[in-house]
Curated annotation (Swiss-Prot):
[4Fe-4S] cluster 1 binds at C32, C36, C39. It comes from the Bacteria. It comes from Paenarthrobacter nicotinovorans (Arthrobacter nicotinovorans). S-adenosyl-L-methionine binds at Y38, G80, S131, M202. The keyword Nucleotidyltransferase does not apply. This is GTP 3',8-cyclase.
Length: 355
């Protein structure tokens, strides 16, 4: 068992390896209106009760502690699907009133987004990420088990038009399903000014069917894109970001340099094969108020029970600091590589953690 956080560990959310968490990922709900194959079962998942999930006032208080006392500088709202929460706009508005300069972004599947973009922007949302794995209706429906592609595309366009940019798109490639679509998806994104990020499938599916063999790796993604594009490393500093970014140029046939102008950027998030644990600066709070220092942690620390028992902000801050001090060196274990023989997949799926 790792040693407890020493008294002289300093302020903020620091772990025993010297990393400082400044990026807060907060899940608003475990509920979702899609059933993506790499995240959720087709049927039968039991949602948390309303009482088990943090209320709006509890969310606002926890964020206030993170920002005001513990050095949180960025907030991302996640789910589940945050748009299914009826008080989402009110939550964002209150967070914005309390923290006028805080970047507040949100990850969404985009279903119903077009109708909610204007109030979200007015409330103070800064930026948005939308999950989009395919532009083909049949493939999209196969992956998400719901026929909502048109709604998602409308939401992406509405977010861009409302100024919630840069709009980022997240795509998970599945072998034999949508991997061949990678070049056309990138072409579509850069043409419209969106930043596409390809994400290696992680072992966070509810069915526990993930295998390293079936995953499309970052190296394979680069190879798929190289048929149509030339990728060169983005000169901007990565600064702890999960995505390795590349400038995108169209591959030009014939003599000469063989490069066209820069069309945009693409990101590749290689959590499995090229992990970035040593630079991680994230702290995660689940919808029921539990601290997870890593997506793959099997250990959780309950803030909500403490909060509801009358704990002070100082008490909650100390509990949060103690939890983050125990953050493992890599991937929820003290080794690098999710395909290591002793890796144990967390019980929670991505929807129950918050992406």
């Amino acid at each position: 068992m790792p040693a407890a956080r020493p008294a002289g560990a300093g302020v903020g959310l620091v772990d025993r390896y010297g990393r400082r968490a400044t990026d807060m990922r907060l899940s608003l709900t475990d509920k979702c209106n899609l059933r993506c194959t790499y995240c959720m079962p087709a049927e039968g998942l039991e949602w948390l009760s309303k009482q088990a999930v943090m209320s709006a006032s509890e969310i606002v208080r926890i964020v206030g502690i993170g920002v005001g006392r513990l050095g949180v500088r960025e907030l991302r709202l996640t789910g589940g699907e945050p748009l299914v929460r009826h008080d989402l706009v009110d939550i964002i508005a209150e967070l914005r009133r309390n923290h006028p300069e805080l970047p507040i972004s949100m990850t969404t599947n985009g279903v119903g987004l077009a109708k909610k973009v204007a109030p979200l922007k007015a409330a103070g949302l800064t930026r948005i990420n939308v999950s989009l794995d395919s532009l083909h209706e049949e493939t999209f429906t196969k992956l998400t088990r719901r026929p909502f592609l048109d709604q998602v595309l409308a939401g992406v366009d509405a977010a861009w038009a409302a100024g919630l940019g840069p709009v980022k798109l997240n795509a998970v490639l599945m072998r034999g399903i949508n991997d061949a679509e990678a070049p056309s998806l990138l072409a579509w994104a850069v043409e419209r000014g969106y930043e596409l990020r390809f994400i290696e499938q992680m072992p966070l599916d509810a069915d526990h069917g993930w295998t390293r063999r079936n995953m499309i790796t970052a190296a394979e993604i680069r190879d798929l894109l190289s048929t149509d594009f030339v990728l060169t490393p983005d000169p901007r500093a990565r600064d702890g970001a999960p995505a390795e970014r590349f400038e995108v140029r169209r591959r030009v046939a014939g003599s000469g340099a063989g490069l066209g102008p820069v069309l945009g950027t693409v990101g590749i998030i290689a959590s499995v094969t090229e992990p970035f644990c040593s630079d991680c600066r994230r702290t995660r709070i689940t919808a029921e108020g539990r601290i997870m220092s890593c997506l793959f942690s099997r250990e959780e620390f309950d803030l909500l029970v403490l909060l509801r028992s009358g704990a002070s902000d100082d008490d909650l801050a100390r509990r949060w600091q103690d939890a983050m001090w125990l953050k493992p060196k890599a991937h929820g274990m003290d080794h690098v590589g999710l395909d290591a023989p002793d890796f144990v997949q967390p019980d929670r799926s991505m929807s129950a953690i918050g992406g």
